[in-house]
Amino acid sequence: MSEKLYPVLPEAKKNTLIDNETYLEWYEESVSDPDGFWAKHGRRIDWFKPFTKVKNTDFNGDVTIKWYEDGVTNVSYNCIDRHLKSRGDKVAIIWEGDNPYIDKKITYRELYENVCRMANVLKKHGVKKGDRVTIYLPMIPEAAYAMLACARIGAVHSVVFAGFSPEALAGRIVDCESTFVITADEGVRGGKPVALKENTDTAIDIAAKQYVMVNKVLVVRRTGGKVSWGRGRDLWYHQEVASVEPHCEPEPMNAEDPLFILYTSGSTGKPKGVLHTTGGYLVYASMTHQYVFDYHDGEIYWCTADVGWVTGHSYIVYGPLANGATTLMFEGVPNFPDQGRFWEVVDKHHVNIFYTAPTALRALMGAGDEFVTRSSRSTLRLLGSVGEPINPEAWEWYYNVVGDQKCPIVDTWWQTENGGILITPLPGATDLKPGSATRPFFGVKPVLVDNEGNVQEGVADGNLCISDSWPGQMRTVYGDHKRFIETYFSTYKGMYFSGDGCRRDEDGYYWITGRVDDVLNISGHRLGTAEIESALVSHHSVSEAAVVGYPHPIKGQGIYCYVTLMTGADAQDPDELRKELVQHVRKEIGPIATPDKIQFAPGLPKTRSGKIMRRILRKIAEDEFGALGDTSTLADPGVVDDLIENRQNKK
């Protein structure tokens, strides 16, 4: 653990929105008088009908979470219309294409017209308030238009990452019973086409077999690639928007009306539809964007995430646009045409604030400093990290090489369920420690709890819980409130359990140590082990599978699969079968779930009651089998010797 302390930089302190004194004062107010604090900050967005109630939350019993519940507003109005008078000609979105020679700037006025046209297309084809619309798009401006158009008319969007497979897309269409899909002919990533329309067609066929019928598919022409066409179902976006008005009145939405569903992996197989609502979410996304990134008007802000993840929702689209910021959307990848792409984009668009994932940083660090130092990066003022804990070595490289020791780093901890950043440094207020997310944001009350549920005070290790609500918190799992309660509120009564382990040091700083449940963090993206196991077992050669994580130099965690085969299947060439299983998992879930190691085993370590002892599998995957602990409860201890002998990760 790093003991180095980096004091607040004088330059950061000079112009900051929040210094340490203000942080301590506001934080105290936010936890001692949440109603007063959030009433004040709730007014940062515009309300059609002001709220009179602020906080109505209970983490016990049936778990109810309501913020600003009698207020009426509209997210699209707050992200666009309210800026038109003073910022109509300001650039809202800078779009940087996969090809380094293609970009586009969209002003707030142009954003208004594009969003209104798309909203009118949705209405024309029967989409109403409360309907679920699935968005399966690459990182193009139309992805933001689609989200904002749904918000404008009160439809609930479900964005599915364009790297997910047709099977994964179908599961998400079925779960929220979506009948309208927005996609593109193809996406482009790293110079290669991605067959989005083809994937969508396949997904719709799969959904139909589960009695969910998609009626309309709106197709954005991105590449002009050849696509098959469903007559009466498929619509070209460019043709549809040309025939509708560029004005659409925003639908008045109650603060607790749903805004979006975003699916995230859980420790059981089926992804959970995380439901976020309107008022509290936008207050929290816009407030965290302003204060965590110390955002000043006129700055260029770039979050490298994809809108298919929550980081893209909160910190590419909703947070920045609610604040009237200029937000950069990047279609490409960090290593195309080469590993200097990020820094060339920073120079090209004069980026001031840069927010990315440790995975990307580790990969770029490994490519050598010359890809960074050939760019000037002189406009950079602040750096951010998101998605997983950043190891101190990568932090130091980011600070020294990318930031030239002049940019504070905000190492942010939060989750899909949280809506916005929960634990983070504030650049003008917080001394930094490489690898630590430091202190809670306003209104956030972290608690460390041991496995028996005892709250740990002072310096401690434990399970990270949050003891009270904040406005950006998810409200339920879509269609399954029981699962919401069981997943987050049943382990430790009266508290939200994050699923992460954490350490608090002598300065009260928080250090996230990783997942404590059966969820992996791969390149900053969550994947449930049960999801990958289900994909493996659906292959005809596989009898049983167990999946664990292991330390990976680039991705943070790698995917290690233990597989027992059906009788007779072991006659196949093991290398060929491994390749086949890798492709099978990619097809079932998507490239993000590509297994790194597959070990064939005659059996898995199980207790006499049949429970797989994952602790043992994790140790073997980490090549640390000298400390396996008590194995006396195993039904067949001999299984372990075989696993050790044939491990795929021998150092």
UniProtKB/Swiss-Prot annotation:
SUPFAM superfamilies: Acetyl-CoA synthetase-like. It holds the Pfam family AMP-binding_C. GO terms for biological process: acetyl-CoA biosynthetic process from acetate. One of its GO terms (molecular function) is ATP binding. CoA binds at residues 189-192, 311, 335, 523, 586. Acetylated. Deacetylation by the SIR2-homolog deacetylase activates the enzyme. ATP binds at residues 387-389, 411-416, 500, 515, 526. GO terms for cellular component: cytosol. PROSITE patterns: AMP_BINDING. The modification N6-acetyllysine is found at residue 611. It is an enzyme of class 6 (ligase). Mg(2+) binds at residues 537, 539, 542. It catalyses: acetate + ATP + CoA = acetyl-CoA + AMP + diphosphate. Its EC number is 6.2.1.1. Its cofactor is Mg(2+). Catalyzes the conversion of acetate into acetyl-CoA (AcCoA), an essential intermediate at the junction of anabolic and catabolic pathways. AcsA undergoes a two-step reaction. In the first half reaction, AcsA combines acetate with ATP to form acetyl-adenylate (AcAMP) intermediate. In the second half reaction, it can then transfer the acetyl group from AcAMP to the sulfhydryl group of CoA, forming the product AcCoA. Belongs to the ATP-dependent AMP-binding enzyme family. This is Acetyl-coenzyme A synthetase.
